[in-house]
């Protein structure tokens, strides 16, 4: 399966379409939720120290590629409208490549797999235009 087919099919699980499957990493779903592809590698995602949650913390200025501006706009909209956030976790085929991503390389150039986390619901807890943090809670079943 190609990377494009993989990401498109994972967004469909949330009833969301990508504006451009070649570079989009976020979308507002028909359920008015922000659907976003996020890296599943530490240090960006980690377990909450005391609660059963996952925390994703990143900087928009670290992102490269055409999807950055669309993501920034969608993130601001999610903050303003208090949208729930639903993740699609991207995992590199070679985790050793992740340092390149942290160093600012374009993540679209690396082979990866996508996984829609349909039992995670997130809330934007920090968003200042550069830094952002999303805290995800787990649900056993989401209707």
Question: PLM features: residue spans?
Answer:
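Short helix-coil boundary/hinge micro-motifs
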Residues: 1-142
């Amino acid at each position: 399966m190609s990377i494009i087919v993989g990401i498109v099919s994972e967004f469909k699980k949330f009833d969301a379409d990508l504006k451009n499957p070649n570079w989009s990493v976020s979308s507002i779903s028909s359920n008015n939720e922000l659907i976003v592809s996020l890296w599943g590698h530490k240090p960006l995602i980690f377990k909450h120290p005391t609660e059963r949650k996952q925390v994703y913390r990143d900087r928009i200025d670290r992102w490269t590629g055409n999807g950055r501006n669309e993501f920034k706009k969608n993130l601001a909209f999610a903050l303003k409208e208090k949208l729930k956030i639903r993740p699609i976790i991207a995992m590199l085929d070679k985790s050793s490549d992740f340092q390149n991503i942290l160093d600012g390389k374009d993540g679209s150039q690396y082979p990866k797999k996508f996984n829609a986390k349909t039992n995670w619901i997130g809330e934007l807890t920090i968003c200042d235009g550069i830094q952002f943090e999303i805290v995800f809670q787990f649900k056993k079943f989401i209707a």
